[in-house]
Amino acid sequence: DFTNGKLYQTTTLPKGSYKLTVNFKEYGVKAGSSLYFAVAAGNEVPDVDDVESNSIAYHDFGTGENKTPSECVIEFEIKEDTQEVALGFVASFSANSWFRATGLKLELK
């Protein structure tokens, strides 16, 4: 088990509308576990309990399994001339939860 495991990267983005696509090979989120992909202002993604209130945008994977390739798309807007953001995963997993991401693509729309 672990709480608030994070895998993220920071970057500075110019003003604009963005589309972020996250590709997965598979994932399994067991009951009592949480998995998010978050875009947050600043230099770190928030903890699991704060993702929904402290993110510019996020995707909640809920609970369940998906053993086929899939993707999630997150759209968001940067309103400042430039803004530092953190993009990445945050999870609290009980035993036997997992995910395998295969790619991330950030596009300025």
Pin down the residues of each PLM region.
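Exposed beta-strand face motif in extracellular beta-rich ectodomains
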Residues: 18, 83-87
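Extracellular carbohydrate recognition and processing domains
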Residues: 45-82, 94
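Extracellular ligand-binding interfaces
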Residues: 11, 21-62
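Short loop/turn segments at connectors of secondary-structure elements within structured domains
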Residues: 29-33, 81-83, 95-100
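Extracellular carbohydrate recognition
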Residues: 3-4, 66-68, 90-109
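Short beta-strand segments enriched in hydrophobic/aromatic residues
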Residues: 13, 24-26, 41, 78, ...
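Extra-cytoplasmic beta-strand recognition segments
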Residues: 5-35, 72-76, 104
